[in-house]
Swiss-Prot record:
Primary residence: membrane
Family stated for the protein in its record: Belongs to the UPF0161 family.
Species of origin: Mannheimia succiniciproducens (strain KCTC 0769BP / MBEL55E)
Alphabetical keyword list: Cell inner membrane, Cell membrane, Membrane
Identification of the protein by name: Putative membrane protein insertion efficiency factor
Coiled-coil residue spans: none
Location(s), subcellular: Cell inner membrane
């Protein structure tokens, strides 16, 4: 089943896609992580929503610098707090 995304999420994803298609090719590959920071941002926003996804993306971008080791850094899974505990 497809999930519905808010207008804010759609706008943020479009901005990241614009960066991927128009800006990133001009500056070349620079990300030290897998998935790339822009792919991470799209996945974080789609998984966690506009606010938390943006926060996770900002934290990730701040970690992506020449002194960073980089490596595999996936988007954390969404935790469902509505699950009944037995």
């Amino acid at each position: 089943m497809a999930t519905s995304h808010s207008l804010g999420e759609k706008i943020l994803v479009k901005l990241i896609r614009f960066y991927q298609l128009a800006i990133s090719p001009m500056i070349g590959p620079r990300c030290r992580f897998t998935p790339t920071c822009s792919c991470y941002g799209i996945e974080a926003i789609k998984t966690h929503g506009a606010l938390k996804g943006s926060w996770l993306t900002l934290k990730r971008i701040l970690k992506c610098h020449p002194l960073s080791k980089g490596g595999y850094d996936p988007v954390p899974p969404k935790i469902n707090n509505n699950v009944e505990k037995k």
